[in-house]
Every structure is written in structure tokens, then in C-alpha cells.
Amino acid sequence: MQKLVHYRGNLAHGAVLRFPGSYPHEKYVDLMLVEFPDSDRKFGFVVSTGHKAGLILVKLPKEAEAVGSAGIDRQWLIDNWNAWIYESAKVGDVYVAQHYPVPVRAEL
């Protein structure tokens, strides 16, 4: 994972953001960028950790979409972090990964 503010390129579905959380979330929160193909708001974030896992946090506005690629514009995300994504976390504390790693083996 690397800091979002240093990440190069835009974000595609499956990208994971990790940052310090606050109530009602846990100490750290992961969000996954998801695509809603049958919606006028094509991209959004789903909480992927803790008690809120599986819940849609936000559907992003059309202006968040990247031009020329399927995903969202990294600079739009940085500029609009506190207004659209998470008010109490600093964008400088947000880390990004292209996706979760595939486990080497599964333990059930």
C-alpha cells in the first residue's frame, strides 16, 4: 500500500483505501471501490472491514469518473475526500492498494 497522495494513476474497481477511522467505524477502515453498472452514479465505495462491512458508504457523482479509463480520478478523490468520502480523516493519511491480495491458502 502507498499513500493516495503519492499514488500514480486513477483508481479502478477493486481498489482498496485504508485510513484511520472514527465512530461508528473501527480504528482503521477499509473501503473498496465498486462499480454499479446499471446506475447513473457508476462508482462508489463499500465498507469492507468491521461492523459496517458490506454497506455502501457513498455513490460518487459523475464528475468523479476518470476521463479515458474505467475508474475514478485520483485528483478528484484527493480534492473531495472530506466532502464526499470521510469527513474526519485527513487525505494525507489515506493508503491505497489496487486490490486485496489473493490468499496463499484459505483457513476455514
What are the language-model segments listed below?
Residues 1-3, 21, 25, 38, ...:
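Generic low-complexity segments that are intrinsically disordered, proline-rich and/or Lys/Arg-biased
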Residues 5, 21, 26, 41-43, ...:
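Intrinsically disordered, low-complexity segments enriched in small/polar residues
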Residues 12-22:
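Tryptophan-anchored aromatic micro-motifs
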Residues 51-108:
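Intrinsically disordered, low-complexity, charged/polar segments
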